[in-house]
C-alpha cells in the first residue's frame, strides 16, 4: 500500500512540475504562443468554457466540453458515412421494388424508380444487384456481351472492376466475375491459369454490381441476359428474377435521409456490414452518441440533441462540398462556373491521405466511380460536368428560366445528355 501511495505522489508531483515548466517555456516564447491562464479566460465551443487560474477547465464546464466533443465527432462520422448511406439507399430502392434476394436485380428505365435515383439520365437502362456475400458465399456475375458499361464496387463505393465496353474485354464476350470478400477462401477447383473467372475481392459484406445498357432502343432486353448465382450453385444455377417499377408505383428516393433518419439508417447499415480498419475511429465517435455494432439504437435525450444538430450541420457541409468544392481539380475552366463533380480517385486515396472532401462531394449527389468515368477523351469512357450557379455566379433557382448554350460538334462518341435535378433529392426533375 505504501508503494502505491508513493507512486501516486510522484505522478502528482511530476504533473505539477510539468505545468510549471510549460509556463516558463511559454513565457519565453513568441507572443503568439504566450498563455496566461486566469479565471476569466473563456473558450467558445458553442458555449462558453471557463478556465481556472491554472488553465484547467472549471469542473462545471466538463460536460459542456464532452457535448462538444461528441457533436464534432458525430459531424465527422456523418461525412465519413456519406457513400455508405448513398449505396444503402440504393439497396433500399431495390428492396422497395421487390429485388430482395441475392440473385435478384432491379431494372430501371423510364419508370418511377429512375426519378428517385441519384443524378441518373433517361437515356440508358440501369441494372443493379446487391448480393450479401456473408450470406451467399462467393458469387458469380456473368456480364453479357454487348453495349454495356458497368462496375463492381463495395458498399463504400470503392472501385474493384469495370465491366462491359470499358473493361479489358470491351463487351465482346460474356465475362464471369467471381466476387469474394477479402477473408473468404478461393473455392476448390479454381484454376487461375485457365482464366475462367475474373476474381474480385471486396472489403464489405455486400457487393454492388451495376451496369448500363447503353442502347436500350436497339437491345431493349440486353440486361436480362445477366446471370447471377452463388458459386456453390454453378452447376445448376436458379433462374434470375428481374424487377422493375410499374408506371403506377410511387417513387422511392434513394438520397441520404435527413435528421435522425440518417442515424437510424446508419445504425441499420452497421449491423449488417463489417467494420473496415479505416472505420474504427468513426465507430468510436458513433459509440459516444449511441450507435454501436451489435446493440440497439436507443439514444438518450442528450444524444438525440447532439445527433439532430450534427445531422443538420453535416448536411450543410455536404451541400457545400458538393455544390462549391474547393478542390483545385474540380475547376473546368477559369472563365466558367461548370465544374468536374467527380474528382475522387477510385481507391479514395491520394498519397498519404484519404480523400474525405472529394468523397463527400461526389457521393452526396451521385454514385459509381472509376477512372473510365473520368476519361476526358471521347470513346474511352465517360466524363461529367456539373453547374450549380448561373453565369453571374448566382445559385440556380427553380422559379427562374435559364438558357443553355451548346457549342457545335459536342465531343461525344456515343451520346451526350443534359439532366436537371432537384437539390433536395438529387433526383430528376419531372417532365
Positions of the model-derived regions?
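Bacterial N-terminal signal peptides that target proteins for export
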Residues: 1-10
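A compositional/structural signature for long, glycine/proline-rich flexible linkers
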Residues: 23-431
Amino acid at each position: 500500500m505504501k508503494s502505491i501511495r508513493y507512486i501516486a505522489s510522484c505522478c502528482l508531483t511530476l504533473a505539477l512540475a510539468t505545468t510549471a515548466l510549460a509556463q516558463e517555456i511559454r513565457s519565453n516564447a513568441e507572443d503568439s504562443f504566450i498563455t496566461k491562464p486566469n479565471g476569466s479566460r473563456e473558450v467558445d465551443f458553442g458555449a462558453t468554457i471557463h478556465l481556472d487560474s491554472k488553465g484547467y477547465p472549471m469542473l462545471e464546464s466538463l460536460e459542456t466540453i464532452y457535448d462538444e466533443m461528441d457533436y464534432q465527432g458525430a459531424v465527422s462520422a456523418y461525412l465519413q458515412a456519406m457513400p455508405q448511406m448513398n449505396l444503402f439507399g440504393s439497396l433500399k430502392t431495390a428492396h422497395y421494388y421487390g429485388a430482395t434476394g441475392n440473385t435478384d436485380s432491379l431494372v430501371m428505365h423510364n419508370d418511377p424508380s429512375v426519378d428517385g435515383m441519384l443524378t441518373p439520365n433517361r437515356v440508358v437502362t440501369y441494372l443493379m444487384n446487391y448480393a450479401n456475400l456473408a450470406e451467399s458465399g462467393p458469387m458469380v456475375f456473368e456480364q453479357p456481351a454487348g453495349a454495356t458499361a458497368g462496375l463492381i464496387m463495395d458498399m463504400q463505393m470503392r472501385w474493384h472492376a469495370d465491366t462491359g465496353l470499358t473493361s479489358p474485354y470491351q463487351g465482346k464476350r460474356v465475362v464471369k466475375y467471381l466476387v469474394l470478400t477479402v477473408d473468404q477462401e478461393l473455392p476448390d477447383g479454381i484454376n487461375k491459369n485457365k482464366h475462367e473467372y475474373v476474381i474480385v475481392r471486396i472489403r464489405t459484406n455486400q457487393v454492388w454490381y451495376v451496369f448500363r445498357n447503353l442502347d436500350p432502343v436497339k437491345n431493349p432486353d440486353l440486361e436480362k441476359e445477366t446471370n447471377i448465382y452463388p458459386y456453390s450453385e454453378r452447376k445448376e444455377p436458379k433462374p434470375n428474377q428481374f424487377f422493375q417499377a410499374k408506371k403506377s408505383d410511387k417513387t422511392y428516393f434513394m438520397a441520404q435521409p435527413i435528421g435522425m433518419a440518417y442515424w437510424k439508417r446508419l445504425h441499420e447499415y452497421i449491423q449488417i456490414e463489417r467494420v473496415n480498419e479505416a472505420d474504427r475511429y468513426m465507430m468510436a465517435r458513433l459509440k459516444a452518441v449511441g450507435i454501436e455494432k451489435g446493440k440497439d439504437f436507443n439514444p438518450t435525450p442528450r444524444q438525440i440533441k447532439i445527433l439532430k444538430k450534427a445531422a443538420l450541420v453535416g448536411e450543410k457541409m455536404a451541400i457545400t462540398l458538393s455544390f462549391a468544392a474547393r478542390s483545385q481539380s474540380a475547376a473546368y475552366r477559369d472563365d466558367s462556373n461548370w465544374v468536374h463533380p467527380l474528382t475522387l480517385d477510385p481507391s479514395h486515396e491520394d498519397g498519404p491521405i484519404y480523400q474525405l472532401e472529394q468523397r463527400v462531394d461526389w457521393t452526396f449527389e451521385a454514385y459509381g466511380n472509376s477512372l473510365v468515368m473520368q476519361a476526358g477523351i471521347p470513346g474511352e469512357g465517360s466524363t461529367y460536368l456539373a453547374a450549380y450557379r448561373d453565369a453571374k455566379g448566382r445559385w440556380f433557382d427553380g422559379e427562374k428560366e435559364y438558357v443553355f448554350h451548346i457549342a457545335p460538334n459536342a465531343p461525344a462518341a456515343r451520346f451526350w445528355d443534359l439532366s436537371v435535378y432537384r437539390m433536395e433529392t438529387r433526383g430528376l426533375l419531372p417532365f
